[in-house]
Curated annotation (Swiss-Prot):
Organism: Oryza sativa subsp. japonica (Rice)
Cellular component, GO, one term: extracellular region
Record-linked InterPro entries: Cystatin_dom (IPR000010), Cystatin_sf (IPR046350)
Descriptive protein name: Cysteine proteinase inhibitor 4
Organism taxonomic ancestry: Eukaryota, Viridiplantae, Streptophyta, Embryophyta, Tracheophyta
Annotated site residue numbers, Reactive site: G51
Keywords: Plant defense, Protease inhibitor, Secreted, Signal, Thiol protease inhibitor
GO biological process assignments: defense response
A family per Pfam: SQAPI
Keyword Signal belongs to the record: yes
Family of this protein: Belongs to the cystatin family. Phytocystatin subfamily.
Length: 158
């Protein structure tokens, strides 16, 4: 009887391995567009790469995104002041576009419109467009401005 148990266990293990391999092969075939990345299924079976950027819909109505835009301008002003880079401050206008990416937290790529305070700046007080990247870690109640710079394709930049 002892000789039959290992054969039964071996058969079960072999079956588990075969099912796992078949399942993995089936998933790789149906994963779509190459890249071999992990995919997240959404309605209708269409997948997207986990960790990829997604557009934020209704940016102007998204209070969190608008607040992050305001935070990015305030933080930029604070950093300029601490480096003694002059008195020119930006005044937040609005976030005009945003993308969200899941990292260890949420990374927001924001396109922010802001004007120089005191309207008589070098561009006559016209809003300028800036790109900002902010990381939010809600469980730590933390927001960090990573970058803030004039948008490369902004028509108001000289």
């Amino acid at each position: 009887m002892a000789a039959r148990c290992p054969v039964g266990v071996a058969s079960v293990l072999l079956l588990i391995v075969l099912v796992t391999v078949a399942s993995a092969a089936s998933g790789a075939r149906s994963g779509g567009g190459g890249g071999g990345g992990i995919r997240e299924l959404r309605g209708g079976g269409a997948g997207r790469r986990v960790g990829g950027r997604t557009e934020v819909r209704d940016v102007e109505g998204d209070r969190e995104v608008q607040e992050l835009g305001r935070f990015s301008v305030e933080e930029h002003n604070r950093r300029r002041r601490s480096r003694d880079c002059g008195d020119v401050r930006l005044e937040f206008g609005r976030v005009v576009a945003a993308q969200r990416q899941v990292v260890s937290g949420l990374k927001y790529y924001l396109r922010v419109a802001a004007a120089e305070e005191g309207a008589a700046g070098q561009n006559g007080g016209e809003p300028r467009v800036f790109d900002a990247v902010v990381v939010v870690k809600p469980w730590l109640e933390s927001r960090t401005l990573l970058t803030f710079a004039p948008a490369a394709d902004s028509p108001n930049e000289s």
